[in-house]
């Protein structure tokens, strides 16, 4: 397998940042509503591994549900994948966040001769630029 891209968890807020979130210390503010994924689902386990035990106001069964809470204004901040922020213009990352793991690594492998060209394309600068445009960390 050839790793072609990574995805990592980031703190996101509704566009305009109404809660005036400026850094990781805001994850523990009592006056803000924090949405995360629940323990036992991949995004929840990854969130806990990256940020530790957070005082969440809501624990969702999917990252899409966390994203919905942000979009609807039901949460002031939430932890989602970087690609979710790139795909949803109604949320933003409120401060520069390093691409820290644990992260999801996407790898490709050719199972036949016909797949070799596709795997080579995924590793190309063209494909890497497309992946980066969609929020993935590239290799």
What spans do the regions from the language model cover?
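Exported/periplasmic ABC-transporter solute-binding proteins
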Residues: 2-139
